[in-house]
């Protein structure tokens, strides 16, 4: 019996208390459960857009962590980020209140629906949102939880009354294998989270289990442009796997005739899936996003729709309501024909994809790409130092801020200066400089930027708050400069 199957359990639970409710994953769980009728309360150390959204819904959000916060709770939900010395966690143990992980709660919520789980090193959030777009277009009204804010809904989760539950599945600590998926998506597999997995083989094994756990009537969708994914699925014969790609001619779903213009990608899709006797072409699919990586993300959504025999005409136009994900190549603003972009990219593969997209735009308008990168976690920089050194070669100027530690202690003898020096030694043509204080960013950028340039701010830390105000700051500096010139002339 699941939490959803027995509606009477809602009143028996008492309060579901969520520790760290402001996190992107936890806030989604909270919103879905609240809309299902559960009594939800949570706590977090800081307020953010997620906690404010939950408060507006009517959810009690407590500031800080305190043992008294769990009073009246019937269940406590925690994420992997919550340490065992957390006072609320300790109080729940003493009170013998059941403590379950976010992944376990997500699994329970998904169990009464047809569960579609999207995992992979990169592109999970966008892929999840694109699948939701097609399902909405087909009138299927799914329930959705993503790892980012969907711009068309201003939330990362919403409840639908249909049969499908579409959710991003976090692979960082192997909890994604707990999700009772009927359909599993793997976007790619990259060297990441080795602090948990210890080695790359263990990470690959977790993805294998993710597929093997599917029921006999389920199927996986996998990107075979990714060589690691390609090698993985070649060894799995006990589950149905639909493949997609751009470069791979053998993919069941393949995009070709790709064109980009004015923020849109258009392409044709060749279908060689199991349920088609002959090859089928969908022409002129339009995606309101740029970049090869986003086209690949859309192909995963198309693959699921095709396998479920959804209307091909609806599939073709299924992305028209896609408004993007917050911090995924988000245009913050413009000033003096200069564009400021904010992006969550914090892994070398993500950085390369983001820079490639910016480079395409800049080249068309004869501008430059000026990148500002905030490294995220000492452990990630140490683990992927060589990859970080080589991923910025297509920018014209690069500024690297101090490392956002995300709670880690500096035990790696690394700094942002280490990365700056390494990049300088490899790419003499790239202008690269450290930024010791992001408050100085507007003045630094203002002195360098020219019309038609793209200013690209990347990182998973607090660089986003600097990106949010940069256009206004640059505009203010421009006005001051113009006023100063006029005053001097007079």
UniProtKB/Swiss-Prot annotation:
Q: Which GO terms describe its molecular function?
A: ATP binding; UDP-N-acetylmuramate-L-alanine ligase activity
* Residue sites binding ATP per the record: 120-126
* Keyword Ligase set for record: yes
One GO cellular component, as annotated: cytoplasm
Q: Where in the cell is it found?
A: Cytoplasm
- Metabolic or biological pathway, per its Swiss-Prot or TrEMBL entry: Cell wall biogenesis; peptidoglycan biosynthesis
User: Which GO BP annotation is one of this protein's?
Assistant: cell division
Which reactions is this enzyme annotated as catalysing? Answer: UDP-N-acetyl-alpha-D-muramate + L-alanine + ATP = UDP-N-acetyl-alpha-D-muramoyl-L-alanine + ADP + phosphate + H(+)
* EC code(s) of this entry: 6.3.2.8
Family, similarity comment: Belongs to the MurCDEF family.
Under the heading PANTHER family, the entry gives: UDP-N-ACETYLMURAMATE--L-ALANINE LIGASE, UDP-N-ACETYLMURAMATE--L-ALANINE LIGASE-RELATED
NCBIfam families per UniProt? murC
Q: What is this protein called?
A: UDP-N-acetylmuramate--L-alanine ligase
Q: Which organism is it from?
A: Orientia tsutsugamushi (strain Boryong)
What would be the name of the gene that encodes this protein? murC
